[in-house]
């Protein structure tokens, strides 16, 4: 029986690279995507499906967690709140694009699915550099989440949450992704647009800076 990993794939660079690294480690990948009615959900879902096809994933899940939008309080799900432009968050205070406890919600559900599918690992693409001010993107939080899942599941099930990118910056992530032949042109990072990336939101700026510092050109289309 092959070892299995549940890979949480948003459609972005980091989670996609994590899935490729899981495959390199010899895991059979079960892919998981969450629809929480964020602004770019349709584009992210399209990217997820293309990434699964590129990885030859045989089993995938797209789960509706739209109650996250009902909770609100963030610019990703509430279109009445403007997405900040041309400024990178460097504060310890969560930015308005922070979705409260999102990774906690995702990992709780992933833990349930991992137990059902008998996965020995969960891969999630959290990056501390990206998560400045995001309390659920730290290595400490992930370790606590792993303890929580293992405490709350059956005694004969133990899962390891793997975060291979947590200490890397965006340039290193781009370099590693290209080294591993990850099709970054299939990924999406923009918080606001689904046709052409805005090039101005926090996520676009981090992505563009990563490509620039790594010395490579991003192949996706940008408005600016």
Curated annotation (Swiss-Prot):
Highest rank taxon of the organism: Bacteria
The protein's enzyme class: ligase
UniProt-annotated binding residues for Zn(2+): 190, 198, 201, 204
Keyword Disulfide bond among record annotations: no
A Pfam family recorded for this sequence: QueC
One GO MF term attached to the UniProt entry: ligase activity, forming carbon-nitrogen bonds
Catalytic activity line of the entry: 7-carboxy-7-deazaguanine + NH4(+) + ATP = 7-cyano-7-deazaguanine + ADP + phosphate + H2O + H(+)
Annotated protein name in UniProt: 7-cyano-7-deazaguanine synthase
């Amino acid at each position: 029986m092959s070892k299995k990993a549940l890979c949480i794939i948003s459609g972005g660079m980091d989670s996609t690279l994590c899935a490729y690294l899981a495959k390199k480690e010899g895991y059979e990948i079960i892919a998981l995507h969450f629809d929480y009615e964020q602004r770019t959900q349709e584009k992210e879902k399209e990217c997820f499906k293309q990434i699964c096809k590129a990885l030859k994933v045989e089993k995938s899940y797209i789960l509706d967690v739209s109650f996250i939008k009902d909770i609100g309080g963030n610019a990703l799900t509430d279109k009445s709140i403007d997405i900040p432009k041309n400024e990178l968050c460097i504060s310890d205070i969560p930015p308005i694009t922070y979705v409260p406890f999102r990774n906690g919600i995702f990992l709780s559900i992933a833990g349930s699915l991992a137990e059902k599918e008998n996965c020995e690992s969960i891969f999630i693409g959290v990056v501390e550099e990206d998560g400045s001010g995001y309390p659920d993107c730290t290595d400490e939080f992930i370790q606590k989440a792993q303890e929580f899942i293992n405490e709350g599941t059956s005694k004969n099930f133990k899962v390891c949450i793997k975060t291979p990118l947590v200490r890397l910056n965006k340039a290193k992530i781009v370099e590693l992704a290209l080294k591993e032949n990850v099709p970054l042109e299939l990924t999406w990072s923009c918080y606001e647009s689904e046709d052409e990336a805005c090039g101005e939101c926090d996520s676009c700026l981090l992505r563009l800076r990563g490509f620039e510092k790594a010395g490579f050109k991003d192949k996706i289309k940008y408005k600016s």
